[in-house]
């Protein structure tokens, strides 16, 4: 009986300690281990997530992410900036009296019906997209409903402003932002962001961000992933009005890194305007002192001719680095007749070998080489499940840390946490993959303890890492911009650039 009673007491105490452990995981591990061992019940259980693949991967990243030897001091960013009005896409469309019909992509939106069809199309795929709304009055009516929506939130928007805001979080960096900055945006910007007076305007540019969650339903429609649909009637950014202000500000600011974005905003313009403006973009970039790297951040596009012109009309050779996602990468290949261009869209997680082939083609056909007058030597690719940094050998350093840092910020920003909470993230990357689909690539099996995989192909180095995908993302907008900014922050360019 005494033996039974002692066993029962030990059992109850073990149960109690287990409950304490589950309910109060923040208690010091030493206190829990001491209590557990005093009961002589063997080794204490590991805290949640520590031994999981997600926990091991997060710990491995932390060990790999180190600042480069040579760091940026002054970063200039331009030229698109706006105020993002973020709210539930389904709730807004319901408030507008719309119902989900058959989804259909529209390269440009002209009506509420076009908006409903395009939103349904992309929500059904769980894919991000950005479209221009041509009707000024209809857009302002929708924008007013969205802005006054009880759950609507206002944030810094526009790739340039978001990238500048991310850089500004580092107090040892000085950040210049050129773009159409109205009163609301100026109020939202970090104090560390300097806006030249010529960039200030009386009225803000508003972009509407319609978000949806993974598994969210609207009648028969169900989103496979959390994502967003963006639309605007943005004339200032659409004309890249701040380009000349941006370039003229560089001489006084003396940056050692320039980040350019906003080319996609020209989709609502005429072909003649696009061609003329792109030539002016190239001329402006050529005025930037030699040795100052220029990163171009691409964004969602539907105009193949505009994308083809960006690729071929000297824009790619003029920049040093590119940032883009899976939609932009495939569209780029389709527009310029690159590899796998017959692929109409991605089916689920983009195939690593296919992505690698397209990145290799961009750098081989349009990148820096002895026989080509091009500065392009780096591409930072990001998709929901993984990231790849591809670089021409001999021009960039610390890319292992850079790709890991970009993936880490994707997890923390999506979940709105300071550090990775392993209970709120999961691995979505393929467990194994081929490094190429066109050549005899290697087969790679993921190891969470060594999360960055490196391979080489004819003078191009690839750094791959999976992403810890947030299960319940708080905000998806600006993730790509944060990823690119963080990757650049940890990158080092060789002086002979």
UniProtKB/Swiss-Prot annotation:
Residues 1-22 form the signal peptide. Its cofactor is Mg(2+). Catalyzes the phosphorylation of D-glucose to D-glucose 6-phosphate using ADP as the phosphate donor. GDP and CDP can replace ADP, but with reduced efficiency. Monomer. CDD domains: ADPGK_ADPPFK. Its main location: secreted. InterPro entries: ADP_PFK/GK, Ribokinase-like. The keyword Acetylation does not apply. GO terms for cellular component: endoplasmic reticulum; extracellular region. Residues 52-497 form the ADPK domain. It catalyses: D-glucose + ADP = D-glucose 6-phosphate + AMP + H(+). Its EC number is 2.7.1.147. This is ADP-dependent glucokinase. The active site is at 481 (proton acceptor). Belongs to the ADP-dependent glucokinase family. PROSITE patterns: ADPK. Mg(2+) binds at residues 297, 328, 481. It is an enzyme of class 2 (transferase). It is found in: Secreted. Keywords: Glycolysis, Kinase, Magnesium, Metal-binding, Secreted, Signal, Transferase.
